[in-house]
Design a protein with these regions (language model features):
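Carbohydrate-active catalytic/glycan-binding domains of CAZyme proteins
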Residues: 1-489
Length: 489
């Protein structure tokens, strides 16, 4: 069967995967969005269905007033003796922690913290022992992939933290994962930074503590020299073996807006690449160490992709998410409408505005909804495409003493520009946002209010590690949204 990359589109970076009872489970980073750490299930590694989130209670994760790209990132999921563990970093508090569950479809535990610094933590289980690793500095100040043994029940360290590998020489060593395959310990990591120089490297040893020998052909996977090619930034991966005994790596990567336009705004997505072990015991990935647009995988199934999203066919506790620590009393959500009671907090604030959103999953998109606004002068409500509090485009109804206007606001680098406005004879309007690789066109009814370039919502310009979110928003009044549809062409 031929599948096409990415296997999960939109801002779902830092994938980690494990298998249990014939199913595969994957988690991704969520940063400042809540609930945290989206959780997916698959039976074939290609079709992924979101089954919930790992961090669903504010007590599990503190996200109050954190900047964009802060919060929770680089999770790892593992299963040991039927219990699932998710370990991650909360950059807000500079702490590594894990949670667990015995029911993958249920709630997860309160966080258990580990007294080892660094970021991108991972777990490895063997013979009743648990090893915790991250990239940082060990107890002697030596930097690299750092490992200690822990008590999995309490998180307490049972050994000193020791640097076990310093990488192959690339900058920003991160994303360590340890595997035991055919009696050999393989340590996989990412280097080069999560941009165009991103890569996956590996080392191996005869002991869990090393000494680890780097693969002489490192990196084992990178698209840094694959040009002109739309898929770039491949790195931060996790190995998984399928039911046929074949190995694969799930990694992040991104799609440029065009092969000659080095900007990406959809965020880092999930790519699946085959892995082969050679007679020398080293593994290679993809096409001579690169990730391509399509591959063949064993299995009798069809690659499916949801192309239309409505209130009725999405779940408020799955596809949708909020910003930081939402005030849930401000939301009334049902199968046919959403009512948002706006506060004084706006999208420009490093706070929790009344805002609910989904990831933008592809370049060609059309999002539409009828918006009805109630409130006094200064109330606003409408649709937005947002990557940070400083970079977002908003088509809004705005209340004034003289009535309602439809306004188009472009926010670029913290500079606010009112591109256009249109008086409305009432308190409701139908808004549409049409997107392609290069820009967003904004409509009130049949009238185009303006246009915003995708370039300014890209990671290269806006900076950070997230991707564009398509959302509903209200401030200083109440906005009712009906007839919502987000369609990918």
């Amino acid at each position: 069967m031929i599948y096409h990359n990415p296997v999960l589109k939109g801002f779902y970076p830092d994938p980690s995967v494990c298998s249990y009872n014939g199913k595969y489970y994957m988690v991704c980073s969520s940063f400042q969005y809540f609930p945290g750490v989206p959780l997916f299930e698959s039976s074939d590694l290609v079709n992924w269905k979101q089954i919930g989130y790992v961090l669903t209670r504010p007590i599990q994760v503190m996200l109050d007033k954190i900047n964009s790209s802060g919060g929770v990132f680089a999770p790892t999921i593992r299963c040991n003796n039927g219990r699932f563990y998710m370990v991650t970093t909360n950059d807000t508090t500079h702490q590594n922690f894990y949670v667990y569950t015995d029911d993958i479809y249920g709630e997860w535990s309160e966080p258990i913290y580990v007294d080892q610094g660094g970021i991108d933590p991972s777990l490895f289980f063997e013979d009743g022992r648990t090893y915790f690793m991250s990239n940082g500095a060990d107890d002697n100040g030596v930097g690299g992939v750092v490992q200690c043994e822990i008590d999995i029940a309490t998180g307490k360290k049972l050994s000193p933290s020791r640097c076990i590998w310093q990488g192959s020489g690339g900058r920003y060593l991160e994303s360590p994962h340890l595997y035991k395959i055919n009696g050999v310990y393989y340590l996989m990591a990412a280097e080069g930074g999560t941009e165009y120089g991103h890569m996956i490297t590996c080392a191996r040893a005869d002991s869990v503590w090393g000494k680890f020998e780097g693969n002489p052909k490192n990196p084992v996977l990178t698209n840094r020299n694959k040009a002109p090619f739309i898929i770039q930034g491949i790195g931060h991966g996790d190995l998984v073996q399928d039911e046929y005994g074949d190995w694969h790596v799930l990694s992040l990567g991104f799609r440029q807006q065009h092969i000659w336009r080095p900007y990406h705004h959809l965020g880092r997505e999930v790519f699946l690449t085959p892995v082969k072990f050679g007679e020398d015991g080293w593994f290679t990935c993809g096409n001579d160490g690169t990730t391509d647009e399509s591959y063949e995988i064993k299995g009798d199934f069809t690659q499916n992709e949801q192309r239309v999203f409505t209130f009725a066919n999405t779940s408020w506790d799955k596809e949708w998410c909020f910003m930081r620590r939402p005030v849930m009393e401000n939301y009334e959500l049902s199968d046919d409408k959403a009512v948002l009671h706006g506060s004084d907090i706006t999208l420009d604030d490093v706070d929790s505005p009344t805002f609910i959103a989904m990831r933008q999953r592809d370049f060609n998109m059309e999002m539409t909804s009828t918006v009805k606004l109630t409130g006094s002068a200064g109330a606003v409500g409408g649709l937005t495409v947002l990557i940070t509090e400083n970079e977002h485009y908003d088509i809004l109804l705005e209340k004034s003493e003289s009535g309602c206007k439809a306004v188009l606001m472009l926010n670029i680098g913290g500079i606010k520009h009112r591109q256009n406005e249109l008086p409305i004879g009432g308190d409701s309007a139908k808004f549409t946002i049409k997107a392609d690789n290069y820009g967003y066109s904004f409509f009130c009814g049949e009238v185009q209010l303006g246009y915003g370039s995708t370039k300014y919502l890209s990671s290269e310009v806006a900076e950070g590690f997230t991707g564009v979110m398509t959302g509903l928003y209200a401030a200083r009044g109440t906005a009712e949204f009906t007839g919502f549809e987000c369609r990918y062409n």
